């Protein structure tokens, strides 16, 4: 209902002429009804909380958030086109400029990530930190929820997609942490076992920073 263009059809208001007054040209005023703006605000108000409240618990949830962002940008762009074509050109132009700038910044950022990690995954996943693992057969890129350059293999794996399962189970030659402004090679420093599962901690090579194992690993473990 909020997406219907009929809500944004301008209303034409004509000046009434009284019987005793001389006839004169009617003054026509065109305006978009309030329901159109209310519908647009309601849609945006519903999408933005959904965009920021969905968790990053899995790759599927992140893809859903990215699709919601695309739908929101498309909705606002179509709305701005409708406003520009009708009578609300200042409002429509401002909204269109906002949408174009937002889409340009998003596209540049995502294309840069695609070139950096040599994968199209950033186009459908809005996260900005990735782990790339290379094996003899090839490489796999998985997005991660944290921004620190470390990785714990086969531990607390929430996502069960093919790429995440491979990265947490395969034996690989190289592990790289890729963020927006850096690319860091990770090396294994410690192994531990928990509930019969063997996990490996990867940190940057020659790193002087301490690794908070109390955050990424439980307090009771066997090293």
Swiss-Prot record:
InterPro entries: a/bCoV_VIROPORIN_3A-like_CD (IPR046446), a/bCoV_VIROPORIN_3A-like_TM (IPR046445), MERS-CoV-like_ORF5 (IPR044323). The keyword Oxidoreductase does not apply. Keywords: Host membrane, Membrane, Transmembrane, Transmembrane helix. Residues 22-125 form the CoV 3a-like viroporin TM domain. It is found in: Host membrane. Disulfide bonds: none annotated. The keyword Transmembrane helix applies. This is Non-structural protein 3d. The lineage of its organism: Viruses, Riboviria, Orthornavirae, Pisuviricota, Pisoniviricetes.
């Amino acid at each position: 209902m909020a997406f219907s263009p009929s809500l944004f059809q301008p209303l034409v208001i004509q000046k009434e002429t009284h019987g005793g007054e001389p006839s004169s040209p009617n003054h026509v005023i065109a305006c978009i009804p309030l329901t159109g703006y209310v519908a647009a605000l309601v849609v945006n108000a519903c999408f933005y909380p959904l965009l920021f409240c969905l968790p990053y618990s899995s790759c599927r949830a992140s893809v859903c958030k990215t699709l919601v962002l695309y739908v929101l940008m498309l909705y606002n762009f179509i709305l701005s086109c409708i406003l520009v074509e009708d009578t609300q050109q200042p409002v429509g132009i401002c909204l269109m400029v906002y949408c174009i700038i937002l889409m340009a910044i998003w596209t540049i950022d995502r294309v840069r990530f695609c070139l950096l990690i040599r994968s199209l995954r950033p186009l459908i996943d809005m996260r900005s930190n990735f782990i790339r693992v290379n094996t003899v057969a090839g490489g796999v890129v998985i997005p991660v929820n944290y921004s620190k350059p470390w990785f714990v293999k086969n531990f607390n794996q929430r996502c069960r997609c093919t790429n995440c399962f491979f990265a947490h189970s395969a034996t690989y030659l190289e592990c790289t942490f890729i963020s927006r402004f850096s690319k860091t090679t990770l090396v294994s420093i410690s192994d531990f076992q928990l509930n019969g599962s063997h996990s490996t901690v990867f940190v940057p090579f020659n790193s002087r920073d301490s690794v908070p194992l109390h955050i990424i690993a439980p307090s009771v473990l066997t090293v």
